């Protein structure tokens, strides 16, 4: 029997959309987007996070200004319940992906274990 792993992956993509984790994330994201302040702050947070990740990948050190900026944004985010809720839903989604990833890589882990 031939297995088309891409069909399985496409089915998984559709099933992810039906999970409570995805639906909760989708709702939380919509709520953040509806709130102008929360949306702008979350976008700023994403930009800063992306820039920091890029610097880390390039092996660059963070400047004092960048560290200060990260702390300021984190403090602001802590005061916005919509963003805190969204980030909680993101953590739940990431946990789902982590669990699924462990299942997917199990054959490789077993291969190298023996």
Curated annotation (Swiss-Prot):
Entry-linked InterPro entries: Com_YlbF, YheA/YmcA-like_dom_sf
Pfam families documented for this protein: Com_YlbF
Transmembrane segments: none
Family according to the record: Belongs to the UPF0342 family.
Family matches, as HAMAP family: UPF0342
Protein name: UPF0342 protein PEPE_0673
């Amino acid at each position: 029997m031939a297995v088309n792993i891409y069909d399985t992956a496409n089915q998984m993509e559709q099933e992810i959309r039906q999970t409570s984790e995805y639906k909760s994330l989708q709702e939380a994201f919509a709520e953040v987007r509806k709130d102008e302040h929360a949306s702008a702050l979350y976008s700023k947070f994403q930009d800063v996070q992306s820039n920091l990740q890029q610097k880390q990948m390039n092996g660059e050190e963070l400047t004092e200004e960048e560290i200060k900026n990260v702390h300021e944004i984190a403090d602001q985010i802590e005061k916005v319940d919509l963003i805190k809720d969204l980030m909680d839903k993101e953590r739940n989604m990431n946990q789902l992906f982590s669990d699924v990833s462990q299942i997917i890589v199990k054959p490789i882990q077993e291969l190298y274990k023996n």
